[in-house]
Every structure is written in C-alpha cells, then in structure tokens.
A protein has these predicted regions:
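An amphipathic alpha-helix adjacent to DNA-recognition modules
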Residues: 3-15, 20-32, 39-66, 74-77, ...
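Amphipathic alpha-helical packing segments from all-alpha helical-bundle domains
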Residues: 94-132, 136
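Helical hydrophobic small-molecule/effector-binding pocket
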Residues: 67-109
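Short, hydrophobic secondary-structure boundary micro-motifs
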Residues: 23, 88-90, 150
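Hydrophobic recognition helices of helix-based DNA-binding modules
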Residues: 52, 56, 60, 111-115, ...
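Terminal, non-globular segments
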Residues: 7, 108, 143, 164-167, ...
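Hydrophobic alpha-helical segments that form the core
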Residues: 122-164
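Secondary-structure edge/capping motif, primarily at the C-terminal ends of alpha-helices
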Residues: 64, 87-90, 115, 141-145, ...
C-alpha cells in the first residue's frame, strides 16, 4: 500500500532513532510546506500523529479475502513490531495521549464490526469492551518498546477476540 507524502516524511523522520521532541517547523521543512498550510489541515502536531496512526491502523486492519479477525490483528502487530521506533516516538512525543485512545479504540471497534457484520448479530457493547482491551494491550506493548514476544501479545488479543466470535457461534 502506497504511503501519502505526509506519512512518508513522518515515518522516515521518526523511525531512525528515539526522538524526545518533534516540531511543526521541522516537519514543514522536511515536507517543504509553510506552517500556514500545516495549520489549515491540522490543529497541532498531535493531530497530525493521530491522522497518520488512523490511516495506518485502517490499512493494517483491512480484511484481505477470507482472512480471520485474528490474522488481521496479527498482521497489525507485525507492522507495529517492524516500526517499533516510529510508534514509540509517536507515543513519547504526543502531548494528548487520550486523543490516541479515543481514535484508535474507535478504529479497532470499527474493524471488528466490519468483520462481524456479514457473519451475523453481535453485541456493540461487547465490541467496544474488546476494543478497549486490545488498545490497552497494544499501548502497553508499544510503551514497553515491543520487548514482549509478539506471540504473547497476539495470544492476549486472541483471548479477547474469542468473546466476540462466541456471539456468532451462539447465533448459529
């Protein structure tokens, strides 16, 4: 999947090494735009981070063929592990982590709902609870610099996803 120019610059700048501070001015210089153009699209740097995270999460959780929900999330975990410096920097630099929570939790819930919708009835409340749990697991893994084995993190997410899939089995 092709990255947008904004994503390319941000991923390149934040993937090389650990960064404590990243400014709008530095981003605009690398993208070769003025700050006014940046602020027409984003309210601050955290807004930019959130939009890039949203795009990357949507791409990673897009169902491919007859792929299971477990495979979608495992694919996303692999992508996070491959770019752990980038994701770690985003969380470290962000001035508004609760915004990440609201947006990413919603994206996880939306991916689960899109997977479940053609398969039968499901509880929206249960989907939201599972999405909260998945966010907490992934957030803690990223904050810990992806030190835990990806299979352990995947197993934790799999245990949550089984609660959703049980709803389908009961309906059948």
């Amino acid at each position: 999947m092709k990255l947008t120019k904004t994503e390319q610059v941000l991923v390149f700048e934040l993937s090389r090494y650990s960064v404590e501070k990243y400014t709008v001015t530095k981003f605009c210089q690398k993208l070769d735009i003025n700050r006014g153009a940046f602020y027409r699209r984003n309210s601050n740097i955290c807004d930019l981070f959130t939009s890039v995270l949203t795009l990357q999460t949507r791409r990673a959780l897009r169902s491919v063929g007859n792929e299971s929900m477990d495979r979608m999330f495992y694919r996303m975990l692999k992508k996070i592990k491959e770019n752990k410096t980038f994701y770690g920097n985003l969380h470290r630099i962000a001035k508004d982590p609760p915004l990440f929570y609201r947006v990413l939790r919603k994206e996880y819930a939306l991916a689960i709902e899109n997977y479940m919708r053609p398969r039968g009835p499901f509880s929206v409340r249960k989907v939201e609870l599972v999405a909260n749990g998945i966010y907490a697991i992934i957030f803690n893994w990223v904050v810990d610099e992806c030190r835990h084995d990806i299979r352990d993190v995947y197993q934790s997410i799999h245990l949550l996803l089984t609660h959703i899939e049980q709803t389908i089995r009961r309906a059948e």
